[in-house]
Amino acid sequence: MAKTNTGRWLAGAAGLAAVGSVAGVSVARAVTRRTTDDDPHHGEDFGLLDADRSYVVTTPDGVPLAVREVGPADAPLTVVFAHGFCLRMGAFHFQRARLTAQWGPQVRMVFYDHRGHGQSGDAPSDTFTVSQLGQDLEAVLAVMAPRGPVVLVGHSMGGMTVLSHARQYPKRYGNRIVGVALISSAAEGVSRSPLGEILRNPALEAARFAVRYAPKTVHRTRGAARSVIGPILRAASYGDEKISPSVVAFSEKMMHDTPIATLVGFLHALEVHDETPALKTLAKIPTLIVCGDRDLLTPKEYSESMAEALPKSELLIIGGAGHLVQLEQPELVDDALVRLVERATPSKLVAITRRLRDRARNHG
């Protein structure tokens, strides 16, 4: 029996690794071509967020979440960013860098790492669920934004986190939470995307079993699990082969640094989550839905489906972009976030615009 299971495990790993290698070859070719061109982000300080004001928010079950903050503590609006699967808050690097100047003192931005990701603490594998992530977001909001209007921005699993929060805390929306952006995300499990095929791989099942029931042996499944998921994640990240090599290296490091227990632990959550009831709550407020038309992990059909259910949504499909659209096409994403804030807080933005015009006139 054990021999048969081992054979199935190896065959499954080889089969999915072959699928992954096809994607990996396309990435390797693209990266090779990219390195021959000028890199617009050579020398970029991707550690910018690490220098911002630092806090730790401890969840009710005792997990320390790393938090960064930029902007005045008394800003009229707070924008909270939730990153995606196998990433960390740095995935919003360009939003942090550019929107700080765009919004100035009128907006405070808060970023945090999910449990098991980045600089946040580890957690039991049975807490690696989308519902738990929604509760973690509530813990961050309770400490970092206890008063005043808030806009939530979620990328990939971070978008699912926002949806989970909306399902569990619907009374927060329309009153405290005045706008939401869902970037490269989905309201229900991603079993219909290429990621869904990966989730059924015996290699990942073995790693998931080790994480849950034999954590001391998880290192034995590390290589097989990464060989299955890694190439797919890398291939799906960017749609344009002209993407900056520095940006590619930055995102790949985030993925590589994610603990294997986190990687396999959250995969099942991505497959089975269903936050479609949250769409009824989000229908009350302005929303932004963004997706690249070359996103292989959360294809644009997921975004289009959410937009149909949200009458106050702006749907932005970015041509040629992959799953990490906020790193690949930051200007388009940033502009869309500015529009969302303007729609979510129109009265405040009118006053802000008037003050800026008066200031410019006085200095003219």
Segments the model singles out, each with a brief description of its role:
Residues 108-160, 167-173, 335:
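Active-site loop/oxyanion-hole signature of alpha/beta-hydrolase fold enzymes
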Residues 216-281:
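Conserved alpha/beta-hydrolase catalytic His-Asp/Glu region
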Residues 63, 68-122, 143:
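Conserved HGGG/HGGXW glycine-rich cap/lid loop of the alpha/beta-hydrolase fold
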Residues 84-88, 155-157, 186:
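Active-site glycine-rich loops that stabilize anionic/oxyanionic intermediates
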Residues 167, 171-220:
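Flexible "cap/lid" loop of the alpha/beta hydrolase fold
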Residues 5-32:
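Hydrophobic alpha-helical topogenic segments used for membrane insertion/localization
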Residues 282-283, 289-291, 295:
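Short beta-strand/loop motif that positions the catalytic acidic residue
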Residues 308-364:
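Catalytic active-site module of serine/aspartate enzymes centered on a nucleophile-bearing elbow/loop
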